[in-house]
Amino acid sequence: MSSHSVLEGRGLKKSFGPTVALAGVDLTIHRGEAVAIMGPSGSGKSTLLHCLAGIMRPDSGEVHLLGDRIDTLGERRRSALRRTRFGFVFQFGQLLPELPAEENVALPLMLGDVSRPQAVRQARSWFGPLGLGGMEGRRPGELSGGQAQRVAIARALVTRPAVVFADEPTGALDQATGHDTMRILVEATKHNEASLVVVTHDPHVAGWCDRVVEVRDGFILTGPLPAQTSGQASGWAQEGSR
């Protein structure tokens, strides 16, 4: 594993019955970079994310995080790894509706045995930079779609993970809000020196990333390509009311 690599999949294969989802995929994620995994539905892109993130085990192949092999770990250790070294942003946020925003963000810390008061203090520090000031006590149902995704971004980053995984993070948002959400996701992740892996079918989303990898029928079709990004704004919290 390269000294500049944070996460590496080697020869990853995964099948579901007769359906081959991954057919021997190699992918390296470097420190601090954003990588888009693109492909149509059923191409294997989400399966690749799940194998890299330790959500599922590949049938064969290896996954290494910071030089350590993780695909052979038991579920308990992989669960702890997902909670501490990885962050996740999903299409619909997956926030707990009964908890205020600040406790949704604090939850990964509390699951890692940080006291509730300390976890909430750490969680609150994310709200201003992400344009969520004053929304700490709101429940998910009181937030717009874009605001809820910003809360999910804060939750993904609160443990200072090595890698953030985002699966169709703008799929439920309108174009303008999705653009703003991707800008914040990329900028906040890079600011915290984490790598970002984004699964998407949308070239506009992929355009925010440093590299694009295309997956089809379980194979990577081409080598990683540089993304074409335009119009990136600076400052996480611009247009924060969406």
Residue ranges of model-derived segments:
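Helix-to-loop junction immediately C-terminal to a conserved catalytic motif
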Residues: 53
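Conserved ABC ATPase signature
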Residues: 139-143, 147-149
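Conserved ABC transporter NBD signature motif
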Residues: 61-69
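The feature captures the beta-strand-to-loop junction immediately N-terminal to the Walker
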Residues: 38-40
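Catalytic Walker B motif of ABC-type/P-loop ATPase nucleotide-binding domains
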Residues: 164-167
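Conserved signature/switch motifs of ABC ATPase nucleotide-binding domains
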Residues: 83, 138-141, 159, 192
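Short coil-to-helix segment of the ABC ATPase nucleotide-binding domain corresponding to the Q-loop/switch region
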Residues: 99-107
